[in-house]
């Protein structure tokens, strides 16, 4: 991986986290927010880039989490490269998706300006739904890491419209992080093994460990299984 500019300047490193949604109940958004919190505690500065609107963006309440934890953020428009598996495959649809790629390249120019202004050393792309961060990182010669959290077809009924193009961008990343062995096994068929690594989501023990709470004391145990 390219040596970060912050360490070369003898300054604190700064990471830009590229979100694909703005949803306080989204697992991916929560994981990214927790990552920002942990990085800040380690004296690594962070900024978050959230999309303006779109089919996968959500209700727009993710910013409340960022404000609560005093995480600096920017709203930058972007368009996902992911579509539903039943999305039409015809000339008009393909032309529309090509138009979105061109628009994302324009949006990436604005993001590149933010990366330069903020003196960002590393770009972290939070899901496979967003890819314009890769354009911006390459434009200003900043290394980027890509987090894969989704199977897509198997768990969400979605897919890349241009899979080969998306895998090409992902293969150019300095690191691709799979959150499980199963995710790794799916994507390593299309991505270079030397850029992929399995890193499980961290758990804040203090958030879940409640020794003072008494459970399983009643004679009848009632369980609710959801999913």
Report each predicted region and the residues it spans.
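N-terminal strand-loop element at the rim of the active site
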Residues: 19-25, 38-98, 183
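Carbohydrate-associated surface elements
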Residues: 182, 202
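Nucleotide-sugar donor phosphate/pyrophosphate-binding loop at the beta->alpha transition
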Residues: 106-107, 132, 143, 150-172, ...
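A short beta-strand/loop micro-motif in the catalytic core of glycosyltransferases
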Residues: 123, 172-181
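Active-site proximal beta-strand in glycosyltransferases
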Residues: 15-16, 134-154, 177
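Glycine-rich phosphate-binding loop signature in dinucleotide/nucleotide-binding domains
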Residues: 114-120
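Conserved donor-binding/catalytic core segment of Leloir-type glycosyltransferases
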Residues: 15-18, 216-227
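An aromatic- and histidine-rich active-site surface loop
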Residues: 56, 104, 108, 122-140
């Amino acid at each position: 991986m390219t040596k970060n500019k912050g360490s070369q300047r003898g300054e604190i490193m700064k990471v830009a986290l590229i979100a694909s949604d703005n949803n306080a109940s989204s697992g991916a958004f929560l994981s990214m927010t927790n990552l920002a919190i942990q990085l800040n505690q380690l004296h690594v500065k962070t900024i978050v880039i959230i999309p303006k609107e779109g089919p996968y963006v959500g209700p727009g309440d993710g910013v409340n989490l960022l404000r609560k934890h005093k995480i600096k953020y920017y709203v930058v428009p972007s368009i996902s490269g992911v579509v539903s598996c039943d999305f039409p495959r015809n000339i008009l649809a393909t032309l529309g998706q090509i138009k979105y790629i061109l628009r994302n390249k324009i949006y990436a120019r604005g993001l590149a300006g933010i990366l330069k202004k903020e003196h960002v050393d590393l770009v972290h792309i939070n899901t496979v739904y967003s890819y314009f961060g890769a354009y911006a990182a390459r434009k200003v010669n900043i290394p980027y890491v890509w987090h894969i959290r989704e199977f897509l077809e198997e768990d969400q009924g979605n897919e890349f419209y241009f899979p080969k193009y998306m895998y090409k961008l992902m293969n150019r990343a300095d690191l691709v992080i799979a959150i499980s062995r199963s995710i790794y096994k799916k994507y390593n068929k299309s991505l270079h093994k030397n850029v992929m690594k399995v890193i499980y989501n961290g758990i804040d023990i203090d958030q879940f460990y409640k020794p003072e709470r008494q459970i399983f004391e009643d004679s009848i145990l009632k369980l609710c299984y959801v999913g």
